[in-house]
Amino acid sequence: MLMPKRVKYRREHRGKMRGRAKGGTEVAFGEFGLQAQAASWITNRQIEAARRAMTRYMKRGGKVWIKIFPSKPYTAKPLEVRMGSGKGAPEGWVAVVKPGKIMFEIAGVSEEVAREALRLAAHKLPVKCKFVKREENGGESNEN
């Protein structure tokens, strides 16, 4: 599972997910990418499930880049505990994803294989996604 090696503080504020992604909105490493269409928290378990679905479909061929990292801790209180008495214990790690962010990239496989692998990965994620291709001039084409 992905998680930071060490953090300065064990607990963080939840924050707001306003606006679009500032960086990472173009296919940089691979040929095809999976782009988020909405804002969401994506847990380290969801990232791992999506990665497994992609690599299993591609039969270990090609290369996969994971462009998001779960660096934000989220907390939860135990069941049947009354309100108050402090913030809950750290429960897991999430990556904050905003609209436009490329989450996964693939290279070394055909477009049909990449499209299906990224479709399987998108089903593991709690956010609506779009398949994008790298353009020759450096950007990506927004074809669905």
Swiss-Prot record:
One of its GO terms (molecular function) is structural constituent of ribosome. Keywords: Ribonucleoprotein, Ribosomal protein, RNA-binding, rRNA-binding, tRNA-binding. One of its GO terms (biological process) is translation. PROSITE patterns: RIBOSOMAL_L16_1, RIBOSOMAL_L16_2. Gene3D superfamilies: Ribosomal protein L10e/L16 (3.90.1170.10). GO terms for cellular component: cytosolic large ribosomal subunit. It comes from the Bacteria. InterPro entries: Ribosomal_uL16, Ribosomal_uL16_bact-type, Ribosomal_uL16_CS, Ribosomal_uL16_dom, Ribosomal_uL16_sf. Part of the 50S ribosomal subunit. Belongs to the universal ribosomal protein uL16 family. HAMAP family: Ribosomal_uL16. Binds 23S rRNA and is also seen to make contacts with the A and possibly P site tRNAs. This is Large ribosomal subunit protein uL16.
